[in-house]
Amino acid sequence: MSESRLPHLSGTGDARMVDVSEKAVTARSATAAGRVLLSAECVAVLRDGTVPKGDALAVARIAGIQAAKKTPDLIPLCHPLFISGVDVVAELIDEGVEITATVKTTDRTGVEMEALTAVAVAGLAVIDMIKAIDRAAVISDVRVLTKSGGRRGDWSREDDS
């Protein structure tokens, strides 16, 4: 594999942290989304606000924000970034919870991993809050929806609204 295709690999195939010191500092953002699929009973409990452990959606939002800030501690080759904003939305839908996270920075590398981490950990927080009600909950479809800034410019997933 060429270095340009997988920049986290050295010429000999060893993992490395990419040197971004020569890259321009630019405004960047990324939005990711995912779902927690739940039973109808669990959705009803969430809708009624009677989850025994408390407000699952509020906990998910805070967990997602915290996760975005901790991404370089969790993903070994991610750069520590100056995150200027994180917005996590956790909405109840018929199938469970839809989670969306937008992360912004002005830095040398993008924030896709921070947005993905925010969504994944927010989903884990939902499961932690409702596991006594629905042991079969599933985190699903975690993906980047959009990214902006940087050398390659803006990108948007075509198969998502």
Predicted regions and their residues:
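C-terminal binding/interaction regions
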Residues: 1-57, 62-77, 83-161
